[in-house]
């Protein structure tokens, strides 16, 4: 989970964790 991808981490599975 990064700066913007942190939202996807708690809302849904970290699918965008690879793409920052």
UniProtKB/Swiss-Prot annotation:
Keyword rRNA processing: no
Provenance organism: Cicer arietinum (Chickpea)
UniProt keyword terms in alphabetical order: Antimicrobial, Fungicide
Name of the molecule in the record: Cicerin
Function text: Has antifungal activity against B.cinerea, F.oxysporum and M.arachidicola. Inhibits cell-free translation in rabbit reticulocyte lysate system.
Gene Ontology biological process: defense response to fungus; killing of cells of another organism
Oxidoreductase is among the record's keywords: no
Region listing for Disordered, in residue ranges: 1-20
Top-level taxonomic group: Eukaryota
